[in-house]
Curated annotation (Swiss-Prot):
Record gene name: rpiA
CDD domains the UniProt entry points to: RPI_A
Active site residues according to the UniProt entry: E109
Pathway: Carbohydrate degradation; pentose phosphate pathway; D-ribose 5-phosphate from D-ribulose 5-phosphate (non-oxidative stage): step 1/1
InterPro entries with a match to the protein in the record: NagB/RpiA_transferase-like, Ribose5P_isomerase_typA_subgr, Ribose5P_isomerase_type_A
Upper lineage: Bacteria, Bacillati, Cyanobacteriota, Cyanophyceae, Synechococcales
Protein name: Ribose-5-phosphate isomerase A
Binding site for substrate: S30, G31, S32, T33, D87, G88, A89, D90, K100, G101, G102, G103, K127
Keywords associated with the record: Isomerase
């Protein structure tokens, strides 16, 4: 029997698919919930229920999965606009600000989200938080030659950084762009995401950080109500 978290993720992935229509250019996110959405999309396309779909992936992992499922893909540079991007998040606060980058894909994810006419975030209820960064560390992608410099600069603004290490190889995680990732914690969490996003990105050697500010249009939240998985839609007023 599936655990409750998996049931929530499956419910929210299916709800997201209902927003997809024929002829759309789609941003296909990364992570476990987004992977369930991509699988559901592949099933809709193969059954003929969705036609003329083009996907733009946010990670190599997503590209491999979409290709295996027969979803037509284009590179980011080949599209001028994305109709709808669907992606997960590691944390979401009440103002729709996000932390992403648990899979070290946040650079491509932010590019796709910023190009999308509509950006829908799919999460289970455990990802909804009052304050960002109290539980999940903020990923910052850095040039390999600059990681120590960036770590010191982040320390000057109150952050404690750790170089993200790989689990199945000796050494650090290397992103799809060939860079390294610092995972950063701020005491008391992040109370002003908009200012901090710019502040970190202004440090020389930083490519991008995992704060997604004012990008999400809707958050679909998988939840369990009376033992049954369901989905709650949160939209900006």
């Amino acid at each position: 029997m599936e655990d409750l978290q998996t049931q929530m993720k499956e419910a929210v992935a299916k709800a997201a698919i209902e927003q997809i229509h024929d002829g759309m250019v789609l941003g296909l996110g990364s992570g476990s919930t987004a992977a369930l959405m991509i699988k559901a999309l592949g099933a809709k396309i193969s059954s003929g229920h969705l036609k003329d779909i083009v996907g733009v992936t946010t990670s190599f992992q997503g590209e491999v999965l979409a290709t295996e499922l027969g979803i037509p893909l284009q590179g980011l540079s080949a599209v001028s606009q994305i109709d709808l991007a669907i992606d997960g998040a590691d944390e979401v606060d009440s103002n729709f600000q996000l932390i992403k980058g648990g899979g070290a894909c946040h650079v491509q994810e932010k590019l796709v989200a910023s190009l999308a006419e509509r950006f829908v975030v799919v999460v289970d209820s455990s990802k909804i938080v009052k304050t960002l960064n109290l539980t999940f560390k903020l990923p910052v992608e850095v040039l390999p030659s600059a990681w120590q410099l960036v770590k010191n600069k982040i320390h000057e603004i109150g952050g404690v950084s750790q170089l993200r290490m790989a689990q199945k190889k000796a050494g650090p995680i290397v992103t799809d762009q060939g860079n390294l990732v610092l995972d950063v914690t701020f005491a008391g969490g992040i109370n002003d995401p908009q200012t901090l996003e710019k502040q970190i990105n202004n440090i020389p050697g930083v490519l991008e950080n995992g704060l997604f500010v004012n990008l999400a249009d809707e958050v679909l939240v998988g939840e369990i109500v009376s033992g049954t998985p369901g989905v709650k839609s949160l939209q900006k007023i």
